[in-house]
Amino acid sequence: MDLQEKLKLLPEKPGVYLMKDEEGNIIYVGKASVLKNRVRQYFQNTDNHPPKVKVMLSHVEDFEYIVTDTELEALMLECNLIKKYKPKYNVLLKDDKNYPYIKITVAEDYPRIMFTRKIDMDGSKYFGPYGSAFAVRETIKLVRKMFPIRTCNVNIEKSLGKVRECLYYHIGLCSAPCTGRIEKEEYRKLVDQAVMFLEGKREWLVEKLKEEMQKAADELRFEEAARLRDQIFAIEKISEKQKVTSINEDEQDVISMARSDDIAHIEVFFVREGKLSGREHYYMKNTEGMGREEIISSFIKQFYESSPSVPKEIIIDVELEEKDLLEDWLSQKRGNRVSITVPLRGKKKELVDMVYQNAVEALKNEILAREKILKDPAVLELSNLLGIEYPKRIEAYDISNVRGEDNVGSMVVFVDGKPKKSEYRKFTIKYVEGQDDYQSMREMIERRFLHALEEKKQIEEGTLSKEKAKFIEMPDLILVDGGIGHVNAALEVIEKLGISVPVYGMVKDSRHRTRGLVGVSGEVQMPVTGRAFRLVAQIQEEAHRFAITFHRERQSKRFKTDLLNIKGIGEKRAKVLYEAFGSIEEIKKASLEELKKVKGMNERSAKAVYEYFHGEV
């Protein structure tokens, strides 16, 4: 059936329509209060359509429609279908599936706080979405400082009293429920307080904590009262830094937008209890030829469709054609009335103007950043092969030992495809006995990131300057020397620490040359003549060189220490012996005559060395 015949069959009912190209791909999704009128408009007076619509129509070969009972149902279905198909010609919230959230697993007996990019129907509380992973991690850290709740997946019931406190307990970021140091009811109080804090109920939370502090003091529980006092101080200190808006005591999200030719930057201020509790920014794509009203409307649909919470009021700076419909949809999601306001004067107008100015500044910075960034072609090729964001900082790890002796690890750093030797780090493996590369890799990775966490804490407390920190910079990509076992070992550690970084293994062929990369989804096909392959080979060689050099230094030091125990052998003779034979094993194998021939050795010293290893001649 051709398009004209299908147009005649369109019903006079609300619903959703899906435009398709010649391959059957859905390239646009829209809703209509009357399908017959809306869809026909596309194919009438086509000369009057905006350029983007004309381009879309040139690819339309077919369409489908779904009838709904109400326009509100059509709106909800439209949101779901746009999220599912991400049509080429719809205005889209850029990479919306990747925006991060804070998750608190309140359905568990001992809830955890964690970073996530996925909302599951598991009874957990979700906060977000946030504009960046960094913002989520910093917020989680802030919450844990005030309300030390766990991030690990330890089975509390099985481990209770059987394990010792981890580092997070000692740096004040966990109350160690796994050890029984805190009662279940007290731990749940911490979780409830963290939830209130993230919900923006800070004044109410402070009042409740003050009541608990007074009660603890009256009952002579002074240590508990002091802890509550510190919590109150921390919350009030944060609140002092927030702008007082003086609108009212309800919840508002304030939204505005700035745009250039190919970028639409959305700025959102979150106002809770009359104070600015947070701000985030987002980008919309496929906005060419679209009006401000359409972009803001699309953002509201996509943002709140995936958001776990909806405020009482949304303040914007442009009138929306479907305002009433959006209010009904948002009210249904929230469970009570939500209003969308476009203020013309007063405090709300001042606030939305301020949000707009922030959007303009952020857009300027984004444009400047794009102009300044000259991405390395090899790194760019690698990011495309792996399907990840451009990894400006790549860290590579290698383990080196001989039959488990002098076990060491190395970390080399490449920034924009170039080695940054000042960032290289060495690790002496301390807690692994024998030759266990997987466990050695776990230890090295864990120590590296625990150092980073500790340094960030010290910087915040003012006891360490950022310039003196050695591990503060976080990687965008981790490469480990080895296969999937090494990859899993590294992933196990960073996931336990709540860190989100892609990890790949650098695998070698039978001739011990770089073959490519392997990840959790399998081996990555890399053209051996490509820039990315040559970069990976260079990184693998550098990681190996740095590890083996450190291993030999450790080995040499140990060998010299052994030789210095021999009467008549000093630093000088120990050095020439090591240079002549290369290892302690070869020195042990050497005959008396071979030892005598070494420059600087005489019969007495040679005999002393020989007898040290073989007994008297």
Curated annotation (Swiss-Prot):
Name any GO cellular component annotation: excinuclease repair complex
The superkingdom listed in its UniProt entry is Bacteria
Does this UniProt record's set of keywords contain Ligase?
A: no
InterPro entries per record: GIY-YIG_endonuc (IPR000305), GIY-YIG_endonuc_sf (IPR035901), GIY-YIG_UvrC_Cho (IPR047296), Hlx-hairpin-Hlx_DNA-bd_motif (IPR003583), RuvA_2-like (IPR010994), UVR_dom (IPR001943), UVR_dom_sf (IPR036876), UvrABC_protein_C (IPR050066)
Presence of keyword DNA damage: yes
Q: A Gene Ontology molecular-function term?
A: excinuclease ABC activity
- The residues covered by the GIY-YIG domain are 12-91
Give an example GO biological process. Answer: nucleotide-excision repair
Instruction: Report keywords, A-Z.
Output: Cytoplasm, DNA damage, DNA excision, DNA repair, Excision nuclease, SOS response
Q: Where is the UVR domain?
A: 203-238
| Residues making up the signal peptide according to the UniProt record | none
Q: Can you state the subunit structure given in the record?
A: Interacts with UvrB in an incision complex.
Query: Entry's NCBIfam families?
Result: PRK00558.1-5 (NF001824), uvrC (TIGR00194)
Report the family membership: Belongs to the UvrC family.
Q: Give the protein name, as stated in the record.
A: UvrABC system protein C
Per the UniProt entry, what species is this protein from, by scientific name? Caldanaerobacter subterraneus subsp. tengcongensis (strain DSM 15242 / JCM 11007 / NBRC 100824 / MB4) (Thermoanaerobacter tengcongensis)
State the encoding gene. Answer: uvrC
